[in-house]
Amino acid sequence: SRKFEPATLARKLRAAAGQGLDAVAFQPLEDPRVHDAISELNGYGIPTAAIMSGFENTSIVGFVGIDNRSAGRTAGYLMGRLLPRAGRVAILSGGELYRVHEDREIGFRTVIRSQYPFLDVICTHGGRDDVEGNYREMCLLLEQYPDLCGVYNIGGGNRGVVRALNEAGVASEMVYIGHNLSRYTRNFLLDGSMDVIIHQNCRLVAEETIRLLVAHLEKEEFRQTMVPVEVITRENLTGAVFA
């Protein structure tokens, strides 16, 4: 998947230096080449803000997004409450280069381990946020663990997971928790293929990012706040904002 290519991201970040841009917002990948590119932009006086996924680099102005550790903990809490019995739960992770996925997994595992020890968590690296990749991975999981009772998809590719669950005839009995409300996941909530969406309002992310960067450029004081973690089910879809 091209979204997981650090060299491409680093090249595009460096190209921003010659495009007359005043500031750059980006979704980071954990890779030395990306860190180097951000440091170079900082050297040119171009401020940068990380969005959606955390990034430990002193050159950035700040991070805008949800508390992803909290999002993972929320998913773990809901999984445990929806599955009050012993069983296996799978984590589908999009990729190791996004800190957001690491944070969500840590939060999820922490809550399951401390509050719901009767659940056995198995982890897979999944299909790198790809629909077909997640479909294949979910098919393998269902074949290997026929007693699987819950799935937490940390990243994208929800359509692939639902397709596999439906083909196996287990969508209605599987507890499935994923991220980001879209026209697809909205329908999955309505037909029962998904139980819960952990959501971040991307409109708020964009607005907060612009405020952060403009305040920095104008040397104004800016009090940054985290974007709220939203929990969406089929019962509170009305008025919910898509990603």
Identify the function of each model-found stretch:
Residues 71-89:
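A conserved helix-loop-strand patch within extracytoplasmic ligand-binding domains
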Residues 23-42, 108, 126-184:
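Hydrophobic alpha-helical
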Residues 33-70, 182-190:
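Flexible loop/hinge segments that line or gate small-molecule binding clefts
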Residues 51, 92, 152-153, 232:
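Short hydrophobic segments within beta-strands
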Residues 21, 86, 145-148, 194:
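Short, high-confidence coil segments that cap the C-terminus of an alpha-helix
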Residues 112, 204-243:
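Hinge/cleft segment of the Venus flytrap/periplasmic-binding protein
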Residues 1-8, 30, 64-74, 91-110, ...:
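Hinge/beta->alpha junction and helix N-cap segments in small-molecule ligand-binding domains
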